From Swiss-Prot:
Residues 1-212 are annotated as: Disordered. The lineage of its organism: Viruses, Duplodnaviria, Heunggongvirae, Peploviricota, Herviviricetes. This is Tegument protein UL47 homolog. Interacts with US3 kinase. Interacts with UL31 and UL34; these interactions seem important for efficient virion nuclear egress. Interacts with UL41/VHS. Belongs to the alphaherpesvirinae HHV-1 UL47 family.
């Protein structure tokens, strides 16, 4: 018996049961000490990376030799009762038990910080990542690899000192250069000795690294920093981190918007040129009939039918009404102190570049009296305005900052964005990290330029804003005519057929042409892409960041100032929640959140179109010789803005159609992200309607300064709204293309968004899907935050929960529709429709693999799941 059973002593033995973690996650990386079988089981990530399931022959031989050697100290370590007694009474010293090595995707990153508040509250143990989610992210994201393990693996794509296009690989590899594992490690003394020899060759080598003629700037410091970074990775992580940060700052200073190395296209893209040429010819003219040119003494008389159709006035946000009632300066200040001679001396009282040669300075400032916006804003006034922003009550209860001087505290280390068990809850750790990330993505780029360049004052932003707004109005002129001729030629074939998005929008568009007699200054045949200067590049970037500039908000004066602050704060809250619920390691959202995101994207895009048509008409009225004709009653009448959002029946009906959907109503009240998104939407809707109402009241014999200030305030809000839509669309598209989630979207939302983004090109530089997620990962790395899948670990599970749905939401849905159909289109699959917008939305440099995850279920290697879509 002893001959057959050895250490068991004849006693029966029970096979040890695998742990829960082993049974839930059988695919383990090579080298895991918990595996008891000899053949390594590789995950699908390993299969995609080219690893094989067979070990090295020498390694197999050594393992066999070790297993064949007899044990002299009970090395077999039987787990039976008799074996336990043998070990107790044996003279051999038992080996120290080794704790199993945790999986990298379940362990927090090294050096992860926790606030004292997070450590006070303990929660249940960390739940393992669902196996289906692991397979879904296998070929796109590094779910389980820690930063230390990545540094030890050689990347075959890094063949030079500079990274190639990020689109040549999978998305999440965003061009970060790491040292190869195959390089021989050297001691510090050897490296110091070599540095003396390399110093003599730096001057020659640094200038020979880049041979491309397009790189004209000497970047010796950048090249040297990259080489030092590669060497530091083999020495210590702390030195590597410091050099990486310095390299990143050097690159940012060179290639950030407005930097010396930042390139801007001087002419419209080929796509825009083709879009305008194919849709309208030189001989095309619009002849409008009717009484448009007659004087309109009572603009409200044309809207009496609205009073009978809509029996209840438009509901405004209760929080907005409270903000206005508590505002200390609710009206326009007429005693603004500024010296016209000083403005002329500073070369500020000049015609915007868009109208140079068309209007002289005196004529332009007579039509748009905006010189008061150049008045000096004191530091105390700016500080009080920033403080008013921070003192606004947020949904999450934490203070939000609008500028660099008021940064938030956050915990470094892992960022966990999984849903919480509580309804309307969110992890506080992720929320604080998202606040810091939102500041870095949307605010710090502008604030760094403003604070570091003393020559950048708010009047430069005012000049950019008025110029960009006028250029946008001219693009509205062109787009409205392109849509008219697209409708006329919708049945043509071949070269005469307009672009399909124009045909789809032509029957439902709200961009309507104005009579040629009142829009001569707006006439153009190609799309305007705006100024191309260093300052304009900064003002156009960062998702519409000008609203965060306190001096600029104050320069516009009330009522524009208070409305801009109100909109900026609540859209910032929405984006914080968006960032706190997804990242590259977990790009998906819950079903309810996706429903709310699609609803807001659809309604906000339509609202942007309504507002751009208002800008189109208001700009023509401000520049016209006679501003009381019937062609301008769209902006002169007050009844529309009292009954419908932004004075639009179409938007009124669209809100009823979308918000009355039971799925949308449930999503609105059940998740924190949905509430933040809806409050952000209704904040913009309320502020824009209020500004348009103030404009109509002052346009008839009121203050022209107030009219001009409101006009500029609407432009500032629209820039932030368009940037928010860009932000929201990239998050939603990332869930569809990178997360593999099935998302239904209204068919006309993406065509409408694409056209409006072209129209607003002078005001906003939109960011593509690929660039958005790459920049997001880069900024997380700068903040020392690591995206992690699953829920946070024990001690970091504090939840910020909204106990009840917001009081602002229930009364915002219209009670009934006025007309049949809102022109939103039918529901289609978002991943499929995005394939038609690879240049405008996904990104011109995107590879063909981007988006396949949304078209094919990401169950790589599992035949039962292949081809299925996530429900």
């Amino acid at each position: 018996m002893d001959q057959h059973h050895g250490a068991r002593g004849g006693a029966p033995i029970r096979r040890p049961r695998r742990s829960i973690e082993s049974r839930s996650h059988p695919f383990r990386a090579t080298g895991n000490t918990q595996r008891t079988y000899s053949t390594p089981r590789l995950s699908y990530r390993d299969g995609l990376s080219g690893r094989t399931a067979s070990r090295d022959p020498q390694e197999q031989a050594s393992n066999q030799d070790e297993s064949s050697n007899p044990s002299t100290s009970n090395a077999q370590q039987s787990t039976s009762f008799w074996g336990y007694l043998r070990r107790v009474f044996s003279d051999d010293v038992p080996a120290q038990p080794q704790a199993p090595r945790p999986r990298a995707d379940f362990a927090p990153p090294a050096g992860e910080e926790s606030s004292s508040e997070e450590e006070e509250e303990e929660g249940p143990a960390q739940a393992p990542l669902d196996e289906e989610d692991q397979l879904m992210y296998a070929d796109q994201y590094s779910v389980g690899d820690s930063s230390d393990e990545n540094d030890e693996e050689e990347d075959p794509r890094l063949g030079s000192d500079y990274p190639t296009s990020a689109e040549s690989s999978e998305y999440h590899d965003h061009g970060e250069m790491v040292a190869g594992a195959g390089a021989e490690s050297e001691s510090e003394t050897d490296i110091d000795a070599e540095e003396e020899e390399e110093d003599d060759e730096d001057d020659e080598d640094d200038m020979e690294v880049i041979r491309d003629e397009s790189y004209r700037l000497p970047r010796t410091w950048l090249d040297k920093s990259i080489r030092l970074m590669d060497e530091a990775l083999a020495q210590s992580s702390e030195l590597s981190k410091a050099i990486t940060k310095s390299t990143r700052s050097l690159y940012d200073s060179q290639f950030a918007p407005g930097g010396r190395g930042y390139t801007q296209t001087a002419t419209p893209s080929r796509r825009l040129v083709q879009l305008s040429r194919a849709g309208m010819y030189d001989s095309d003219k619009i002849v409008m009939t009717g009484d448009y040119m007659e004087v309109d003494d009572d603009p409200d008389s044309a809207y009496q039918l609205w009073v009978r159709a809509i029996r209840h006035p438009l509901a405004m946000n209760p929080s907005w009404e409270e903000t206005i009632s508590n505002h200390t300066n609710p009206s326009f200040s007429t005693d603004i102190d500024y010296d016209i001679d000083e403005l002329i001396e500073k070369n500020l009282a000049r015609t915007p570049p868009v109208f140079e040669g068309l209007l002289d300075s005196a004529e332009f400032f007579y039509k748009l009296p905006m010189l008061y916006t150049y008045a000096t804003i004191t530091q105390d006034e700016a500080y009080e305005e920033r403080l008013a922003w921070s003192n606004t009550q947020a949904l999450h209860g934490h203070e939000q900052s609008s500028w660099q001087a008021l940064l938030v505290y956050y915990s470094r280390g892992g960022m966990y964005v999984s849903p919480t068990q509580e309804p309307r809850g969110i992890w506080r750790r992720a929320l604080k990290q998202a606040m810091a990330l939102q500041l870095k993505m949307c605010v710090l780029g502008l604030s760094d330029v403003v604070t570091k360049q003393n020559a950048t004052h708010h009047h430069t932003a005012v000049t950019f804003l008025v110029d960009a707004l006028l250029r946008t109005a001219r693009n509205c002129y062109l787009a409205s005519r392109l849509l008219v001729f697209a409708w006329e030629r919708r049945r043509e074939t071949g070269a005469k057929r307009p672009a399909e998005p124009l045909i789809a929008l032509s029957g439902v568009t709200l961009l309507q042409p104005l009579p040629p007699e009142v829009s001569e200054l707006l006439e153009q045949r190609t799309f305007d892409i705006g100024l191309r200067t260093p300052n304009s590049a900064v003002f156009r970037a960062f998702f519409g960041s000008l609203v965060y500039w306190a001096e600029l908000r104050l320069a516009l004066r009330d009522p524009a100032s208070i409305n801009c602050r109100y909109v900026g704060f609540h859209l910032q809250t929405s984006e914080i929640y968006l960032l706190a619920r997804a990242h590259s390691a977990s790009p998906g959202y819950t079903k309810e959140e996706l429903v709310a995101m699609e609803a807001i994207l659809t309604l906000a895009t339509l609202m942007l179109e309504v507002a751009l048509q208002w800008v189109h008409v208001a700009c023509a009225q401000l520049l016209s010789e006679n501003d009381t004709i019937k062609a301008f009653r769209r902006v002169s009448a007050s009844i529309p803005h009292a009954l419908a959002p932004l004075g639009s029946i179409r938007l009124h009906d669209a809100e009823f159609e979308v918000l009355s959907n039971p799925d949308v109503m449930v999503a609105r009240d059940e998740t924190a992200l949905s509430q933040a998104l809806f409050l952000g939407y209704f904040s913009v809707r309320t502020a824009l309607t209020a500004c348009m109402r103030d404009y109509s009241h002052e346009a008839d014999g009121g203050s022209k300064e107030t009219v001009t200030g409101v006009f500029l305030g609407v432009g500032l809000i629209l820039q932030r709204l368009a940037g928010h839509l860009n932000f929201l669309l990239n998050c939603l598209a990332g869930a569809a293309l990178y997360g593999g989630q099935k998302i239904n979207i209204h068919s006309l939302t993406l065509p409408r968004y694409s056209l409006l983004a072209d129209v607003m090109a002078p005001m906003l530089q939109r960011q593509s899907l690929v660039d958005f997620w790459r920049a997001r990962d880069n900024m997380l790395e700068d903040l020392e935050i690591t995206p992690r899948p699953g829920p946070p670990t024990q001690g970091k599970r504090v939840v910020v929960e909204m106990p009840l749905p917001s009081d602002d939401l229930p009364d915002m849905t219209p009670g009934a529709s006025v007309n049949n159909g809102a022109g939103l289109g039918r529901m289609v699959d978002m991943a499929k429709q995005l394939q038609h917008y690879r240049e405008t939305i996904i990104g011109e440099e995107a590879t063909s693999s981007v988006g396949k995850r949304g078209l094919i279920r990401a169950g790589v290697g599992v035949a039962a799941l292949r081809g299925r879509r996530r429900k």
